[in-house]
Design a protein with these regions (language model features):
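Short, glycine-/small- and polar/acidic-enriched structural segments
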Residues: 1-47, 65, 129-131
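Sec-exported extracytoplasmic/periplasmic mature domains
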Residues: 3, 22, 60, 78, ...
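Solvent-exposed, acidic/flexible segments
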Residues: 10-13, 66-70, 91-95, 152-153, ...
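A ligand-binding cleft/hinge motif common to bilobed small-molecule-binding domains
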Residues: 11-23, 75, 103-127
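Stable alpha-helical elements in mature extracytoplasmic
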Residues: 16, 51, 69, 98, ...
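Periplasmic-binding protein-like
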Residues: 34-43, 125-163, 173-196
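Bilobed "Venus flytrap"/periplasmic-binding protein-like clamshell domains
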Residues: 36-100, 104, 115
Length: 200
């Protein structure tokens, strides 16, 4: 939790961003281009679970410790009348470990950050069946600045121009944000926060 009010710039996940904007005096200035926080629910390819409907109460779901993924996943599971308390949750060290649990039949399903899922090895993905992938394009990590930060305009411009030189491009690619950042309006941030609140 971020309680210190002396941090001027924060790159936050959508849930933390909501709290920081509503309660801690931060404003969104930018978000990565084409990089929304989608998630995937998958089961073992060899199991009898081929659709979300096949998941039943008492099933074990493996996942890395990621609140964003879990909340979006729970919203998707509402469609098949499953709530958090209906399932057993196995928190793994990382997403690869969650995939292994499902493949070894130690869990009936796993939740993944979509980007991580699509980056798994071909061999791993061949052993998994995607039950559903979220499509909430408006939800993403955001760059926040503290109200009253005196260099906000310069900083915003620097962030938006970061991809324009080779060094910046290389850094962004390393961070998985090859296309850089785009400006984010207060309206866009409010819309995202409202959406996050409906997920909680």
């Amino acid at each position: 939790k971020i309680n210190a009010g002396n941090i001027d710039l924060i790159y936050a996940n959508p849930f933390d961003a909501a709290t920081l904007i509503r309660e801690k005096g931060y404003r969104a200035i930018a978000r990565p281009v084409g990089k929304s926080d989608e998630m995937v629910i998958a089961a073992a390819e060899k199991s009898a679970i081929n659709t979300l409907e096949d998941l039943s109460k008492g099933a074990t779901v493996a996942m890395a410790d990621n609140r964003d993924v879990k909340l979006i996943g729970l919203r998707l599971l509402e469609a098949v009348d499953l709530e958090e308390s209906d399932l057993n949750w196995e928190v793994t060290e990382n997403y690869q470990a969650a995939a292994r649990k499902v493949i070894k039949d130690e869990a009936q399903a796993a939740m993944f950050l979509a980007e991580v899922f699509h980056g798994l090895s071909r061999l791993t993905k061949m052993q998994l069946t995607v039950l559903i992938e979220s499509d909430l394009a408006t939800i993403s990590h955001v760059l926040l600045v503290k109200d009253g930060f005196d260099k906000e305009d310069e900083l915003t411009q620097a962030v938006l121009d970061f991809h324009k030189d080779d060094e910046g491009k290389a850094t962004l690619t390393e961070l998985g944000m090859a296309e850089g950042f785009e400006a984010m309006s207060e309206e866009d941030a409010e819309f995202m926060i409202d959406l996050m609140e409906t997920l909680q």
